[in-house]
A protein has these predicted regions:
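Domain-level signature for soluble enzymes in the chorismate/prephenate branch of the shikimate pathway
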Residues: 1-360
Length: 360
């Protein structure tokens, strides 16, 4: 390719960049105008709208002709919306910390990089922070594809009035990191017990002599390894940035399908977005056939029940609550009609939230 042709292409790229710059700032000004109108009508107005953002991202993907991948385009627009929302009204999000955990990655994936994220030490602390309006939202883990449900998160919904406002599905990719750059010098490997188990085959093959030490979190493992020349940590790549570690190996998990699901919790219900799911908490009367009676309306109306989990209710021995995930929004047919039937048959019934299905 001639130098003249290259110059033409580069000049075109420069022109596109100038147009993008102008359009991004124009979008930001429109977001500020929206904020002014909302604040004038209601000083306590809510600016982050999960259903609105989900519709925007779905539209971006539907219109995408390539060559950029759908997920790449969605991530770009997520950051644009996050930056504009920060101009309207900064959003504070509590999450299960410490800094550098996969939960922090889930915050970034759902809200973008322009929110104020607040790490807390326990799941119940995240719930309390949102309930007390210390933050607008919280993000907590609820299920891992290998380890199962995070029961503490489920149990918190039995005593909290918060709503589920969103869901984040995050592939879990483990990395080996250390203060030094030579894996041959590693004598100890720190990580959470689950992560050590999930990387056992890789460790057996590559670091068979290294001592494996379980700690409270992967972020704590990275912090510990940052102060020891002959130690390494297994954690997500974000932890390496936080604690100044070098990545020695990436994607060392034994099962590449390892995925964690997170819930976004908040104080207000979310309107329909056209592609939603609903989470429920129900308890059935203690009589034969009661559970079948609760589930029968879903099948009769053709509503897909995607998940059912039982947890001890703590009301009495062998008494259980059931957590259900179903397709649809609680305020729209046919699910709305199904829930009225279930409510009339249940010993206890609560909609935990209807929220957009993850876009990417």
């Amino acid at each position: 390719m001639s130098d003249k042709k290259l110059d033409q292409i580069r000049n075109r790229i420069d022109e596109i960049d100038r147009q993008l710059h102008e359009l991004l700032n124009d979008r930001a000004r429109q977001a500020q105008a929206v904020a002014e109108i909302k604040k004038a009508a209601d000083p306590a107005a809510v600016f982050y709208r999960p259903s609105r953002e989900a519709r925007v991202l779905r539209g971006v993907i539907e219109r995408n002709p390539g060559p950029l991948a759908n997920e790449t385009v969605a991530r770009l627009f997520r950051e644009i919306m996050s930056a504009c929302l920060a101009l309207e009204s900064p959003v504070r999000v509590a999450y299960l910390g410490p800094e550098g955990t996969f939960t922090q990655d889930a915050v970034a994936k759902h809200f973008g990089g322009f929110v104020e994220s607040v790490p807390l030490g326990a799941i119940d602390e995240v719930f309390r922070e949102v309930e007390a309006a210390g933050t607008h939202y919280g993000v907590v883990p609820v299920e891992n594809s290998l380890e199962g449900m995070v029961t503490h998160t489920l149990d918190m919904f039995t005593r909290s009035s918060l709503w589920i406002c969103g869901e984040v599905v995050l592939p879990v990719h483990q990395c080996l990191m250390a203060a030094g750059g030579d894996p041959a010098n590693v004598r100890r490997v720190y990580s959470h017990g689950q992560s050590l188990a999930q990387c056992r085959e890789w460790l057996d093959s590559h670091l068979p002599q290294a001592q494996r030490i379980a700690v409270s979190s992967n972020a704590e493992a990275a912090r510990q390894a940052s102060g020891e020349k002959d130690a390494a940590a297994i954690a997500g790549s974000a932890a390496a940035e936080v604690y100044g570690l070098a990545l020695l190996a990436s994607n060392i998990e034994d099962d590449p399908s390892n995925t964690t699901r997170f819930l976004v919790i908040g104080r207000e219900a979310v309107p329909a977005s056209s592609s939603d799911k609903t989470s429920l908490l129900v308890a059935n009367p203690n009589r034969p056939g009661a559970l079948h009676a609760l589930l029968e309306p879903f099948a009769r109306h053709g509503v897909n029940l995607t998940r059912i989990e039982s947890r001890p209710s703590r009301r009495s021995a062998w008494d259980y609550n059931f957590f259900l995930d179903v397709e649809g929004h609680a305020e729209e047919a046919p699910l709305r009609d199904v829930l009225e039937e279930v409510r009339s048959r249940a010993g206890f019934f609560r909609v935990l939230g209807s929220y957009p299905c993850p876009v990417y």
